[in-house]
A protein has these predicted regions:
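Active-site entrance/lid segments in N-terminal catalytic domains of soluble metabolic enzymes
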Residues: 1-134
Length: 134
């Protein structure tokens, strides 16, 4: 096992995150990542409905022992964001990567459940702002 923040935090063998790829990543890929010592992430919007999302999350929690991540678009273009957050509160993943907006609501709702909230940032100023959110 390579010892890094990533391997220690998620108890994985290799410090690798299978990137969330819109309409490419799928549960099978994340399950194989888990079986091979690293961790995968899938965009919530790869599941076309909130019902499919909840079913997919349930499968991943079972097959990956909860060791997977979800990429959430957190701006108004994600019409399912509230439902996705509700589902993630019921079935928490190991981590969430927020993109394209403020992660504040995601942090408030998921961090208390032990979910690591990672945030896409575009510059140091935004990184500091996100860091101040917790």
């Amino acid at each position: 096992m390579i010892s890094t923040w990533l391997t220690k935090t998620f108890e994985i063998k290799y410090p690798i995150i299978l990137a969330p790829m819109f309409l490419v990543s799928n549960n099978k890929m994340l399950i194989e990542a888990y079986k091979n010592g690293f961790i995968g992430c899938i965009p919530s919007l790869n599941f076309r409905t909130p019902e499919e999302f909840e079913k997919g999350i349930t499968e991943l929690r079972s097959e990956c022992q909860g060791k997977f991540g979800i990429n959430l678009i957190v701006n108004k273009s994600n019409i399912h964001l509230k439902k996705h957050l509700d589902i993630l509160e019921k079935h928490p993943p190991a981590f969430v990567i927020t993109s394209l907006g403020s992660p504040e609501e995601t942090i408030k709702r998921l961090k208390p459940l032990g979910v690591k909230v990672l945030c896409d940032v575009v510059d140091v100023e935004y990184a500091r702002k996100v860091e101040s959110l917790g």
